[in-house]
Amino acid sequence: MFPSKVKSAQSLSFSFTKFDPNQEDLIFQGHATSTNNVLQVTKLDSAGNPVSSSAGRVLYSAPLRLWEDSAVLTSFDTIINFEISTPYTSRIADGLAFFIAPPDSVISYHGGFLGLFPNANTLNNSSTSENQTTTKAASSNVVAVEFDTYLNPDYGDPNYIHIGIDVNSIRSKVTAKWDWQNGKIATAHISYNSVSKRLSVTSYYAGSKPATLSYDIELHTVLPEWVRVGLSASTGQDKERNTVHSWSFTSSLWTNVAKKENENKYITRGVL
């Protein structure tokens, strides 16, 4: 039997079906821009072609309350329509990610780090590493879902283009094969259930079989109470366009009423 739950007013919801050039409720970091009603998360040259060694991030400006205590937890759903494309016949790199991080999170390295992590093995909460686009220390306090287009064996990547779930490190906890299609719009549906503690990912192209992935994690044990959600992407020596066409997000902060009632009964009996 599931515990009773009450929805809190402390929820976050937004939906972008297009992106204006001066989108005030978004924070742009690194090379990310908004142009022609889409997000270009990594840099393009004057001809609209991707460039090497680029990193960009876009965060929603309003912080999200992820948890209050062990009895007040947030569930969320986000849907991203995005396109990874290249005009070149060479390999592409490096990928795009949805991430959750502290509100003061800043961009990190390009290439295989996807603008998210200061180094491949970081498991602590901070680093003194610096990126070319910032002088502030980048934090590894990040949970991310990556769509990784470049295989980095040194980072523990499988030998195929994949979706991965990352927790405080670019080394994914779990991965699933992802059949990337050049220039086609992919849909990613990412959700977190605060009751089952499961982070789930489904991604698909129109008319194709979806790729699915999940990982059980208690987000309140690895992330602070207040966070921001964002999108991040990078290129290395090889390159790609990382284009976001739309993005929606909704969250619900739930209170575990049954647990609180039991705690109150215990306290009452103690007083008597």
Swiss-Prot record:
<feature type="glycosylation site" description="N-linked (GlcNAc...) asparagine">
    <location>
        <position position="131"/>
    </location>
</feature>
<comment type="function">
    <text>Mannose-binding lectin. Accommodates most effectively a non-reducing terminal alpha-d-mannosyl unit. Strongly precipitates murine IgM but not IgG.</text>
</comment>
<feature type="binding site">
    <location>
        <position position="112"/>
    </location>
    <ligand>
        <name>alpha-D-mannopyranose</name>
    </ligand>
</feature>
<dbReference type="GO" id="GO:0030246">
    <property type="term" value="F:carbohydrate binding"/>
</dbReference>
<feature type="signal peptide">
    <location>
        <begin position="1"/>
        <end position="8"/>
    </location>
</feature>
<dbReference type="InterPro" id="IPR050258">
    <property type="entry name" value="Leguminous_Lectin"/>
</dbReference>
<feature type="binding site">
    <location>
        <begin position="237"/>
        <end position="238"/>
    </location>
    <ligand>
        <name>alpha-D-mannopyranose</name>
    </ligand>
</feature>
<dbReference type="GO" id="GO:0034495">
    <property type="term" value="C:protein storage vacuole lumen"/>
</dbReference>
<keyword id="KW-0430">Lectin</keyword>
<keyword id="KW-0732">Signal</keyword>
<dbReference type="InterPro" id="IPR019825">
    <property type="entry name" value="Lectin_legB_Mn/Ca_BS"/>
</dbReference>
<protein>
    <recommendedName>
        <fullName>Flt3 receptor-interacting lectin</fullName>
    </recommendedName>
</protein>
<keyword id="KW-0325">Glycoprotein</keyword>
<dbReference type="InterPro" id="IPR013320">
    <property type="entry name" value="ConA-like_dom_sf"/>
</dbReference>
<dbReference type="InterPro" id="IPR001220">
    <property type="entry name" value="Legume_lectin_dom"/>
</dbReference>
<comment type="subunit">
    <text>Dimer (alpha/beta)2. Tetramer (alpha/beta)4.</text>
</comment>
<feature type="binding site">
    <location>
        <position position="94"/>
    </location>
    <ligand>
        <name>alpha-D-mannopyranose</name>
    </ligand>
</feature>
<feature type="binding site">
    <location>
        <position position="152"/>
    </location>
    <ligand>
        <name>alpha-D-mannopyranose</name>
    </ligand>
</feature>
<keyword id="KW-0926">Vacuole</keyword>
<feature type="glycosylation site" description="N-linked (GlcNAc...) asparagine">
    <location>
        <position position="125"/>
    </location>
</feature>
<dbReference type="InterPro" id="IPR016363">
    <property type="entry name" value="L-lectin"/>
</dbReference>
<comment type="similarity">
    <text>Belongs to the leguminous lectin family.</text>
</comment>
<dbReference type="InterPro" id="IPR000985">
    <property type="entry name" value="Lectin_LegA_CS"/>
</dbReference>
<dbReference type="Pfam" id="PF00139">
    <property type="entry name" value="Lectin_legB"/>
</dbReference>
